[in-house]
Amino acid sequence: RTGQPIMVLFDLLSRRWAMGILWNLSNGPCSFRELQARCGSASPTVLNTRLKELREVDLVEKTTGGYALSETGRDLFKRLEPLGDWAMKWVPTL
C-alpha cells in the first residue's frame, strides 16, 4: 500500500467481486443467496470475504433485509456511477 487514500480505495475496489457487490447492492438490499445468484460465478468463500472487507470499511452493512450499501457506500456509488456511463461510451471504441 502506498498510504495514499485513492490507492487504498483502488486496491479494495480492484479485488475480485468488490465492484460487482457494490453494483448489485446499488438497487437495494439483498440476502446472501440473492447476491450470490446476481454475482454468478463468485464462490461463497470469495463473496463472504469481500462482504466482510466491505463491511469493515463501512461501505456495506448488514440489515434485516440482508446486505445493503451503507451511507458511505451509497455516496461512493454516486461518485462511481458516472464512470459507468463513461465506460458505456468508451467500450464501443475498442
Stretch-by-stretch model annotation:
Residues R1-P5, W23, K78-L94:
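Amphipathic alpha-helical dimerization/coiled-coil segments
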Residues T2-V46, K52, V57-E61, A68-R74:
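N-terminal helix-turn-helix DNA-binding core of bacterial DNA-binding proteins
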Residues T49, E61, W90-L94:
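Short, polar/charged, Gly/Pro-enriched helix-capping and turn/loop motifs at alpha-helix termini
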